[in-house]
Curated annotation (Swiss-Prot):
Name of a matching Pfam family: Methyltransf_4
Record has Methyltransferase as a keyword: yes
Record flagged with keyword Ligase: no
Coiled coil, from the record: none
Residues binding substrate, per UniProt: K161, D193, T233, K234, F235, E236
Enzyme Commission identifier(s): 2.1.1.33
Protein name per the record: tRNA (guanine-N(7)-)-methyltransferase
Disulfide-bond pairs as recorded: none
Catalytic activity: guanosine(46) in tRNA + S-adenosyl-L-methionine = N(7)-methylguanosine(46) in tRNA + S-adenosyl-L-homocysteine
Catalytic-site annotation from UniProt: D157
Keywords on record: Methyltransferase, S-adenosyl-L-methionine, Transferase, tRNA processing
Function (record text): Catalyzes the formation of N(7)-methylguanine at position 46 (m7G46) in tRNA.
Amino acid sequence: MVWMNNSENTPGSLPPGRPLQTEFNDGRDYPRLGNFSFRRGTLTDNQEALWNEHWPKLGKVLADEVIDLPEWFDRDAETIAEIGSGTGTSTAAMAPLEAEKNIVAVELYRPGLAKLLGSVVRGDIHNVRMIRGDGVEVLQRMFAPESLSGVRIYFPDPWPKARHHKRRIVQSGTLHLIASRLKPGGILHIATDHADYAEWIDELVEVEEQLEYLGWPEDQSDIPQLTDRQVITKFEGKGLDKEHIIREYLWRKK
């Protein structure tokens, strides 16, 4: 593999120009970000003050540096990566219900991370950390092999236009990368309310040999506690309002 665009990051900011992107050479499909601009957005004065005070401890920006998770969290515990945490409403609501686990929220959108940061600080939540960057690049560069007990991808952008399907995060290469970061027995949980994206995922459920596809148990007591969303996410709520069918997918690392 080849690293591309190694611009130096500044705290809390992404490097200028094309986003960091690894050129994988393993024959699998990986999301291609393309030449489009991410939503920048602005923070309120209060958000900016909280960001400046708390981000250095609770947040990191995408970098070519593997995280020492026990050091970052000040404890050794099962760690779950949530890829695409958005505004973090459900992340902040779930974290206190699983206080024994470490949660790493990965998101590109700074205002979304700022909202989550505010919820974490005001709620005195101690088990959430944040990384600003593309989910695939964060998995590739910042998590060691077999370092995660779970990965969550809840209601990812469906990129509905056919020419944009290459940007969908659920690809054969992404599943392979996630499998390499999961510990044996670790769980991958994906949820979507987009029918075409569900069909896309259906075609990939058996593609990664390191992952055992579990489907979605009819008996709710069989759902691994590690993956219990417990609260309705923002985009799940929008889907339910439109009477969309929620599809859930579970895999276990062999």
